[in-house]
A protein has these predicted regions:
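Flexible, glycine-rich active-site loops centered on histidine and acidic residues
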Residues: 1-58, 99, 105-107
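Catalytic alpha/beta core domains of metabolic enzymes, predominantly
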Residues: 5, 43, 80, 87, ...
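Acidic (Asp/Glu)-rich catalytic clusters
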Residues: 6-12, 91-96, 118-130
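Structural preference for beta-strand elements that scaffold enzyme active sites
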Residues: 12-16, 78-80, 98-100, 134-136
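Glycine-rich beta-alpha junction loops
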Residues: 19-21, 83-86, 105-109, 139-145
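An alpha-helical appendage that flanks or caps ligand/catalytic pockets
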Residues: 36-69, 109-197
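A local structural motif
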Residues: 72-78
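A conserved active-site cap/scaffold subdomain adjacent to cofactor or substrate pockets
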Residues: 87-114
C-alpha cells in the first residue's frame, strides 16, 4: 500500500518503522503466535528487507530478489526509524535514515530525548536517502488558554498513565471526575513524556 501511495503522491509519503509491537504483550503474542516472533534480534534484517522492497537496496540477497512492491514507483516513500531507545537511534544513524524519537511514551524525559538525538547524530552516516541527520520528536502536547485549564484537562491522561503503570487498563474519565480523584496528585508527580501548558 505504501508503494501505491508513493506512486499517487511522489515525495509526500513517509513510513514509520519501529521495533515495538504496537500493543501490550498478550495481544502481540496472540497476533504473532510465537514468542520467537516477538524478539527484536531480527529487526535490522527485517528493516533492510522492507527498505529493499521499497527500492532502497543496500545488501545482497534480500526479499527484493523474489518480490517487488507494486506499482513500481519512480520514488520511494521516506522511511523513518521510530524509537524510544539508544538502540534505535544508533541504528537509524548507522543506516542514514531519518529518526523519530518517541518522547510521548509515558517514561520519556527531556534527557532521554536529548541523549537519543546525540547518539543518532554521532552514529549518522550519509546514505542514498539522506545526506545529513534528520530527527523529529513525537510528544503528547496539551495546550489551553491558561496553565490551570491545561492541567485540568490533562487530569484524565495522567490518571490513565498511573493506572497503566500499575497494570490496570481502565476507561478514561472526564476532567471533572479526574479532578476529584485522590490519585491525581500522585499521577502529576510521575515522570511522563507529556507537555502541558
Amino acid at each position: 500500500q505504501f508503494a501505491m501511495l508513493e506512486a499517487l503522491h511522489p515525495g509526500r509519503i513517509d513510513v514509520g518503522i519501529g521495533r515495538a509491537p504496537g500493543t501490550d504483550g498478550q495481544t502481540a503474542m496472540a497476533l504473532r503466535r510465537s514468542a520467537d516472533a516477538l524478539g527484536a534480534e531480527d529487526f535490522p534484517r527485517q528493516l533492510l528487507d522492507l527498505m529493499g522492497l521499497l527500492g532502497d537496496i543496500r545488501t545482497e540477497h534480500g526479499l527484493w530478489d523474489r518480490f517487488r512492491a507494486t506499482p513500481v514507483a519512480v520514488t520511494s516513500p521516506m522511511i523513518f526509524l521510530l524509537g524510544s531507545s539508544g538502540y534505535s537511534a544508533e541504528l537509524a544513524g548507522h543506516l542514514g535514515l531519518p529518526f523519530s524519537f518517541a518522547h510521548h511514551f509515558d517514561l520519556g524525559s527531556r534527557d532521554d530525548t536529548l541523549r537519543a538525538f546525540a547518539l543518532y547524530r554521532n552514529r549518522f552516516r550519509p546514505s542514498p536517502v539522506l545526506d545529513a541527520p534528520f530527527a523529529i520528536v513525537s510528544a503528547n502536547v496539551l495546550v489551553a488558554p491558561t496553565v490551570e485549564e491545561a492541567e485540568f484537562e490533562a487530569g484524565p491522561g495522567r490518571l490513565l498513565a498511573l493506572a497503566r503503570r500499575s497494570g490496570r487498563f481502565e476507561p478514561i474519565v472526564s476532567p471533572e471526575v479526574a479532578a476529584a480523584d485522590p490519585g491525581l496528585a500522585m499521577a502529576r508527580s510521575l515522570r511522563t513524556g507529556r507537555l502541558v501548558g
